[in-house]
């Protein structure tokens, strides 16, 4: 009986309410005249316990919420109260364009002051590190502003950045200084071929130290200058040190750089150094320096321009992508388990392969001033002419002023010959 009552109570749908004489009463069902004691009814809940109501006007992601609050500037008053003010229309428009900078058609003719602010805003949002979109955005700036975006680029020992951001690096125009030292490019690298393009004809300082170059690479680099008088025709400083595959034949290709003032060929595979010194002095007027030149100490080369911080962002992103996924502790534990020797961790930047050369072993050349150009030859001929004139004056005393003035003018004409004239005379 008790089991039956329990089962009925279990299947009971709840209390029954009856209105009688305007009052509401609860009637419990009784089975076989068994009346259960009246129990207090349990209140029904429309929602489960712990339910809370949240008013959601518009469900958006965090970026959309950030955009809504980004329109205001929050400050605190002296009393400590929070005060907000709306940003200027220029700031709002600048932020919107920088978020969509890769969709700009062209920036040619746009004011430089506004373009610099737009570039800084896009850089702060790291738009130039995005694959695809960053390259398109960077090309819009470089084709419109050239050297303002970047006039000097130092990629010394940053071979990972070159391999990952090659197209972005090739988009820079009107560079004047380019440092690619210790990047192991080789003769067939795409960037070495890009150096001969007209977009980099403005380069005046080029450093290719320790890049596994040979005579073939030097020939390829100088071909546009030798054949079509284009390419690196404005080059004034060249560093080819620590490239042992460059021989005497490769140095001969450098004679086409008529504006070259400083040259470093230390650590190359030269056979007849004395003959190379003579050829450099004869053809392009470069004299061997007995002391190291300050132009090759790498103190003046650095990245300059609007995009100087972008290169650092590229390097940081590249290094983070190259980090190993496994931790050092798990690796050492596995090595101890399998009985292997610990592997020495390679540093992020390899040391220079340059041998520690003394100052006497350095082959650095410089061009003397215009008055001292082709110094030994010019001084010798000037001294011989003066001695011959003195002997003539002693033997034939001619006190006429006209002949004296004519000899002085002829001497001035002789000294003021151009460098090309001396090269032509020395070729006979």
Curated annotation (Swiss-Prot):
- Phosphoserine PTM positions: 406-407
Pfam families associated with the record: LRR_6
Region Disordered: list its residue ranges: 379-412
Q: What are the protein's UniProt keywords? A: Leucine-rich repeat, Phosphoprotein, Repeat
Q: Sorted alphabetically, which SUPFAM superfamilies does this protein's record hold?
A: RNI-like
In the record for this protein, the LRR repeats are positioned at 149-170, 174-195, 202-222, 234-255, 259-280
Q: Which domain of life is it from?
A: Eukaryota
Q: Where is the composition biased (Basic and acidic residues)?
A: 394-403
The record's family statement is: Belongs to the LRRC42 family.
Q: What is this protein called?
A: Leucine-rich repeat-containing protein 42
Source species: Bos taurus
Taxonomy, top ranks, is:
Eukaryota, Metazoa, Chordata, Craniata, Vertebrata
Underlying gene: LRRC42
């Amino acid at each position: 009986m008790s089991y039956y009552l329990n089962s009925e109570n279990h299947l009971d749908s709840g209390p029954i309410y009856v209105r009688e004489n305007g009052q509401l009463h609860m009637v419990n069902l009784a089975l076989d005249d068994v009346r259960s004691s009246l129990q207090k009814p349990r209140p029904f809940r429309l929602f489960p316990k712990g339910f809370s109501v949240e008013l959601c006007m518009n469900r958006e992601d965090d970026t959309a919420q950030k955009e809504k609050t980004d329109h205001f500037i929050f400050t605190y008053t002296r009393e400590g109260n929070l005060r907000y003010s709306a940003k200027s229309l220029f700031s709002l428009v600048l932020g919107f364009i920088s978020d969509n900078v890769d969709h700009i058609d062209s920036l040619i003719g746009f004011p430089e002051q506004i373009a610099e602010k737009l570039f800084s805003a896009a850089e702060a949002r790291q738009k130039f590190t995005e694959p695809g979109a960053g390259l398109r955005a960077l090309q819009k700036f470089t084709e419109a502003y050239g050297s303002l975006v970047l006039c000097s680029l130092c990629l010394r020992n940053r071979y990972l950045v070159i391999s990952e951001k090659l197209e972005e690096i090739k988009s820079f125009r009107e560079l004047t200084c380019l440092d690619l030292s210790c990047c192991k490019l080789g003769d067939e690298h795409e960037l070495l071929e890009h150096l001969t393009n007209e977009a980099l004809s403005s380069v005046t300082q080029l450093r290719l130290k320790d890049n596994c170059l040979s005579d073939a690479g030097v020939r390829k680099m100088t071909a546009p200058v030798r054949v079509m008088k284009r390419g690196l025709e404005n080059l004034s400083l060249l560093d080819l040190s620590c490239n042992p595959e460059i021989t005497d034949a490769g140095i001969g290709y450098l004679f086409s750089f008529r504006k070259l003032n400083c040259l470093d060929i230390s650590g190359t595979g030269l056979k007849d150094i004395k003959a190379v010194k003579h050829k450099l002095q004869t053809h392009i007027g470069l004299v061997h320096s007995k002391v190291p030149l300050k132009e090759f100490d790498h103190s003046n080369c650095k990245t300059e321009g609007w995009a100087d911080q972008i290169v650092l962002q590229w390097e940081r992103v590249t290094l983070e992508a190259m980090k190993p996924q496994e931790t050092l502790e798990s690796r050492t534990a596995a090595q101890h388990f399998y009985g292997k020797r610990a592997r020495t961790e390679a540093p992020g930047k390899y040391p220079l392969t340059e041998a520690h050369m003394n100052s006497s072993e350095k082959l650095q050349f410089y061009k003397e001033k215009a008055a001292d150009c082709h110094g030994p030859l010019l001084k010798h001929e000037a001294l011989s002419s003066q001695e011959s004139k003195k002997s003539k004056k002693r033997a034939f005393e001619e006190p006429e002023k006209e002949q004296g003035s004519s000899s002085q003018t002829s001497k001035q004409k002789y000294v003021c010959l151009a460098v090309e004239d001396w090269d032509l005379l020395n070729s006979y």
